């Protein structure tokens, strides 16, 4: 997210990066790309995280807010609720800092639309769940796409660290329609509790969306194309899924 003085494509790419980190609708916030504050309310047919389902079975509702600060700083919070019983599912918080690559020494010849991004992200699943974790991120931003890598020393609250690298892209088809895609790779670090290393995972997502005023409607398909989810997850959470959703920005 950028302040008004830096309203280039990097600002939109950074906002998209933060929105994805907070698990908002893929590359959403189309009507708020240059605001200092942006919020969304949305609903999705299913909650997915890095290519697999979560414990929040059924449709989920989400409320998110992002804010730009001075000198390229930004932050955001998001909450997720199950629609089947209205119960709390999870929450996220993100603080970050970003800027233009051409402002760095020796990189002045680069396009001002290219940028860098760094952030810290916290996932919270409620008291007593034991799955809360934090991760740090470094990213490269460009018009239409963002590449970033995340590192968590205690992935999902466990003793194992993990790296996750993702490429997110979006392409406008006309004034209303846009296509978006995602490719992610998860690598687990060594854990002496496991006799054999956990295999890497690769997930993908592809979808299409339409913007109607400040509403965004989207349909996507995601799943794993390599590796597998833990065996204690049921088949519905392990398999691919269609995601139908809507969000409104304000």
Where are these regions (language model features)?
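Detector for outer-membrane/organellar transmembrane beta-barrel domains
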Residues: 131-192
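Repeated loop/turn-to-beta-strand initiation elements of outer-membrane beta-barrel proteins
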Residues: 37-39, 71-75, 102-108, 112-118, ...
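Solvent-exposed loop/turn segments connecting transmembrane beta-strands
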Residues: 50-59, 81-91, 124-133, 153-163, ...
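Outer-membrane beta-barrel "beta-signal"
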Residues: 143, 206-216, 236-250
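Hydrophobic, lipid-facing positions within transmembrane beta-strands of outer-membrane proteins
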Residues: 59-65, 91-95, 116, 134-138, ...
């Amino acid at each position: 997210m950028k302040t008004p003085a830096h309203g280039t494509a990097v600002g939109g790419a950074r906002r998209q990066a933060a929105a994805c980190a907070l698990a908002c609708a893929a590359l959403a916030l189309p009507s708020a790309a240059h605001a200092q504050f942006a919020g969304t309310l949305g609903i999705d047919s299913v909650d997915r995280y890095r290519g697999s389902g979560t414990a929040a079975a059924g449709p989920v509702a989400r409320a998110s807010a992002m804010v730009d600060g001075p000198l390229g700083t930004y932050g955001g919070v998001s909450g997720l609720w199950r629609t089947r019983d209205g119960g709390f599912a999870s929450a996220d918080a993100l603080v970050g800092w970003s800027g233009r690559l051409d402002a760095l020494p020796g990189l002045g010849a680069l396009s001002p639309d290219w940028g860098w991004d760094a952030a810290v992200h916290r996932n919270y699943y409620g008291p007593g769940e034991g799955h809360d974790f934090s991760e740090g991120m470094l990213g490269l931003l460009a018009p239409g796409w963002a590449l970033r890598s995340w590192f968590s020393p205690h992935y999902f609250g466990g003793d194992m660290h993990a790296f996750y690298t993702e490429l997110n892209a979006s392409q406008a088809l006309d004034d209303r329609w846009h296509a978006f895609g995602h490719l992610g790779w998860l690598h687990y670090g060594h854990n002496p509790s496991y006799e054999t290393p956990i295999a890497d995972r690769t997930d993908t997502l592809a979808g299409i969306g339409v913007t109607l005023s400040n509403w965004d409607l989207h349909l996507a398909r995601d799943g794993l194309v390599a590796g597998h989810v833990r065996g204690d997850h049921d088949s519905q959470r392990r398999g691919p899924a269609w995601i139908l959703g809507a969000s409104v920005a304000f």
